[in-house]
């Protein structure tokens, strides 16, 4: 599946690569490849309140909590559209620096302004989704979050500094696509195996 090249420890040349790709990965600020989304649900375009589950991604609050914890008036919430991302600064078991998830299940939804939302302006969306699912970006957040500074379970991560975080990514979109396709296929296989296990129980 891949060949092996030396790593300099800076994520510039991952040790595991698909054949045919040997260019060093490039450091980019989040702001280089994504724009912040701050549009409000001012006209109540959606009445679907969203929340982020570290395991399941962006989901309907009602389905997730069996109730809505959002305000009845969601006109002040962010309006997030399908394919856009949101960062939940709340920590949970196994996710010490929160979660970044893409909206996949619905065409749009309303999200609390406690979240930091963004839309890609370049790069393969499935690859970026896989990258943020990998938690490789955690050390970037660690560097900008005040140690021990939490407010009601939320990390103290300023939005402007969040968009200044640097990420090593492949410039070649073909490599991005190959990585994304591999991870998608692997996830589907894991889901299928889990389904078999659940049916046996």
List each language-model region with its residue ranges:
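Short, solvent-exposed loop/turn positions at domain surfaces
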Residues: 4, 24, 68-74, 151, ...
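Non-catalytic DNA-recognition/assembly elements of restriction-modification systems
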Residues: 13-41
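Short coil/turn segments at secondary-structure boundaries
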Residues: 43-51, 144
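A short glycine-rich beta-alpha junction/loop motif
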Residues: 10-14, 108-114, 146-174
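Hydrophobic structural patches
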Residues: 15-19, 179-190
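A short beta-sheet element
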Residues: 74-137, 150, 158
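Sequence-specific dsDNA recognition surfaces
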Residues: 31-42, 52-86
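Extended intrinsically disordered, low-complexity coil regions enriched in Ser, Thr, Gly, Ala
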Residues: 190-201
């Amino acid at each position: 599946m891949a060949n092996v090249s030396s790593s300099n420890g800076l994520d510039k040349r991952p040790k595991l690569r698909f054949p045919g790709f040997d260019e060093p990965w490039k450091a980019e600020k989040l702001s280089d490849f994504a724009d912040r989304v701050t549009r409000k649900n001012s006209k109540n375009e959606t009445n679907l309140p969203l929340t982020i589950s570290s395991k399941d991604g962006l989901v309907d609050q009602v389905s997730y909590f069996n109730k809505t914890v959002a305000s009845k008036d969601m006109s002040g919430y962010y309006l997030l559209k399908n394919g856009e991302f949101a960062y939940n600064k709340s920590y949970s078991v196994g996710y010490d620096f929160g979660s970044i998830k893409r909206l996949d299940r619905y065409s749009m939804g309303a999200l609390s302004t406690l979240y930091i939302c963004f839309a890609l302006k370049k790069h393969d969306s499935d690859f970026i989704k896989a990258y943020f699912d990998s938690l490789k970006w955690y050390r970037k957040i660690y560097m900008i979050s005040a140690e021990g500074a939490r407010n009601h379970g939320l990390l103290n991560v300023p939005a402007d500094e969040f968009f200044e975080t640097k990420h090593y990514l492949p410039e070649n979109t073909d490599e991005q696509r190959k990585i994304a396709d591999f991870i998608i296929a692997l996830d589907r296989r894991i889901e299928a195996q889990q389904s078999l296990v659940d049916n046996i129980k």
